[in-house]
Amino acid sequence: MDKVKFKKGDLVKVIAGKHKGTEGPIIRVLREKSRVVIEGITNIKHVKPSQDNTEAGI
């Protein structure tokens, strides 16, 4: 993404995946991973309980 000029606040539309067709502004650009974070699209992962972590949650 070195030459792509995405920046915070740009309005983008998702073209693939579970959120296909969703539009929203960019809230964060992750250039090292070639990804952007879009407002209104959930990206929170669930934490499963383990022996050390008995509390599960979001």
From Swiss-Prot:
Checking SUPFAM superfamilies in the record gives: Translation proteins SH3-like domain
Q: What is this protein called?
A: Large ribosomal subunit protein uL24
Annotated GO molecular function terms are: rRNA binding; structural constituent of ribosome
The biological process GO terms on file are: translation
Family indicated by similarity: Belongs to the universal ribosomal protein uL24 family.
Specify whether Ribosomal protein is a keyword of the entry.
yes
Q: Which Pfam families match?
A: KOW (PF00467)
Q: Which GO terms describe its cellular component?
A: ribonucleoprotein complex; ribosome
What does the protein in this record do? One of two assembly initiator proteins, it binds directly to the 5'-end of the 23S rRNA, where it nucleates assembly of the 50S subunit. One of the proteins that surrounds the polypeptide exit tunnel on the outside of the subunit.
Q: Which organism is it from?
A: Spiroplasma citri
**How is this protein organized at the quaternary level?**
Part of the 50S ribosomal subunit.
**Keyword list, A-Z:** Ribonucleoprotein, Ribosomal protein, RNA-binding, rRNA-binding
**From which lineage does this chain's organism come?**
Bacteria, Bacillati, Mycoplasmatota, Mollicutes, Entomoplasmatales
